[in-house]
């Protein structure tokens, strides 16, 4: 058989028992020429089936060709959009603004074509650009007057973050329009520049649909720093009514302040409930049984948490954790004025009071001030006349236990602090410094200062 000949297939004759006549040969609907041809026959243009858009009364079905690349063959309706509670536009204005790119088109069933009209607010001279909001005349558009070949898509809503005085975040909505470009957002027309970091312009340019102020929580912005609605040409385009938001925020702040103030009152807790856990020894009241349990070692003297390095005991585990830093010899917190280093930042803050001359703790009896609360409490014992710490050798009494500890060095001849000039030993570093100021500092510049002294331990 030649290659140019048409392919033919012979159907075998029917069984003679069936009583059928012999079958004739049939030519197929395709050939080798058509298969090897470079060009294909054009497809017939798409013609929708008549009545496809109409509901079938018997079956109640519609032709929804949503996934087809061809135009959607369903009646065009405005898409539903749920507007937030504090949006700047009503639904009607939002719907009209979504039509600003295509116009109102002719009347009837799509007689005006697809988007042949002018923008909604093109005749307005007050607006910076075609925002679709400031048109004076109401534009009444019926669903039948919409263009026949265009899908109505709701306007994109962006979110920006504002930080009122209370520190809580408010999300303001504004239309994705060029009426307020990103440069005006960054220059403080909508939000103060204090909320923006150095990388904000690049982030806004890269992601214009999502602009999140990451440093909003860290910026303590007051209520008076918020922009006022007066400088805006369109008050309805503000990112929410700021006065109302700030008013609600002020009420919330006052309510929270009232709860905090109530917790500071005697006999009140953070949740407003009275404290009903009382210490039987000193009469101190607590709002939780756990706090009372932590308080009881003050009277019993129990120190269950013991340091494994030095053997010192503590009433609480947190105090033991802070104590362990002493044995690590790490002092990351340094004073900028004298260069002295400390283990904890709280100790550095207390040390800074010495340079500032700030003594917040003042004795009620003699008026002497102290930088630290511990020194203030120890000083008050001198006015009470009570000396409960006594030496077992000479029966000398002391107000504080560390004074007794240093006193015991006089009996065992331990003087760990030695003067580098004269070699005299002292039990306390305080006594050594006083010795140097009194005798050696007035001799001349060659005399060593307290910083040149070394501490030696004598057996």
From Swiss-Prot:
PANTHER family in the record: ZINC FINGER PROTEIN, ZINC FINGER PROTEIN 771
Cellular localization per UniProt: Nucleus
GO BP annotations, alphabetical order: axonal fasciculation; cell dedifferentiation; cerebral cortex GABAergic interneuron migration; commitment of neuronal cell to specific neuron type in forebrain; dendrite development; dentate gyrus development; forebrain anterior/posterior pattern specification; locomotory behavior
Keyword RNA-binding: no
Keyword Cytoplasm recorded: no
Gene: FEZF2
Coiled coil: none
UniProt motif Engrailed homology 1 repressor: location: 27-42
Organism: Homo sapiens
Pfam families: zf-C2H2 (PF00096), zf-C2H2_6 (PF13912)
Protein name: Fez family zinc finger protein 2
Organism domain of life: Eukaryota
Residues covered by region (Disordered): 1-22
Annotated function: Transcription repressor. Required for the specification of corticospinal motor neurons and other subcerebral projection neurons. May play a role in layer and neuronal subtype-specific patterning of subcortical projections and axonal fasciculation. Controls the development of dendritic arborization and spines of large layer V pyramidal neurons. May be involved in innate immunity.
UniProt keyword annotations, A-Z: Developmental protein, Differentiation, DNA-binding, Metal-binding, Neurogenesis, Nucleus, Repeat, Repressor, Transcription, Transcription regulation, Zinc, Zinc-finger
